[in-house]
Amino acid sequence: MAYVRLTSLAVLFFLAASVMLNVKKTEGGEFLKCGESCVQGECYTPGCSCDWPICKKNHIIATNAKTVNQHRLLCESHEDCFKKGTGNYCAFFPDSDVHFGWCFYAESDGYLLKDFFKMSKDNLKMPMTIIN
């Protein structure tokens, strides 16, 4: 009786291991990793955006896009972000296969970092001269 239980446990373990090893691993992980569907065009998981009807990782949306007009946050230059009104900075992904960047507001994100690190507001200003 114990032999049957042990055998069924071994078979179950083998099936689980084979399924886990067959999952294709990509650089950015699964595109469904956000784990939610779009609610009124919004995704609440950080690093995810709505690609109706599901939320996808931002770099997956940028990889699959053919033009910058396919998503409101895609850009090729800072000017694209200004024109769309979705930010003032176009940041490109470190993966060279992604030809588009992602728009965001550089100053507002800087203030969020300031609050996170509890820095003073003056630390974000660019120095006018270099002091040796």
Curated annotation (Swiss-Prot):
Keywords: Disulfide bond, Knottin, Plant defense, Signal. There is a cross-link at G29-N58 (Cyclopeptide (Gly-Asn)). One of its GO terms (biological process) is defense response. Expressed in flower, stem, shoot and pod but not in root, leaf, seed and nodule (at protein level). Residues 59-132 form a propeptide. InterPro entries: Albumin_I_a (IPR032000), Cyclotide (IPR005535), Cyclotide_sf (IPR036146). This is a cyclic peptide. It comes from the Eukaryota. Pfam families: Albumin_I_a, Cyclotide. Disulfide bonds join C34-C48, C38-C50, C43-C55. PROSITE patterns: CYCLOTIDE (PS51052). The keyword Thylakoid does not apply. The keyword Ubl conjugation does not apply. Residues 1-28 form the signal peptide. Probably participates in a plant defense mechanism. Not active against Gram-negative bacteria E.coli ATCC 700926, K.pneumoniae ATTC 13883 and P.aeruginosa ATCC 39018 at concentration up to 100 uM. Has cytotoxic but no hemolytic activity. The presence of a 'disulfide through disulfide knot' structurally defines this protein as a knottin. Belongs to the cyclotide family. Moebius subfamily. This is Cliotide T2. It comes from Clitoria ternatea. The lineage of its organism: Eukaryota, Viridiplantae, Streptophyta, Embryophyta, Tracheophyta.
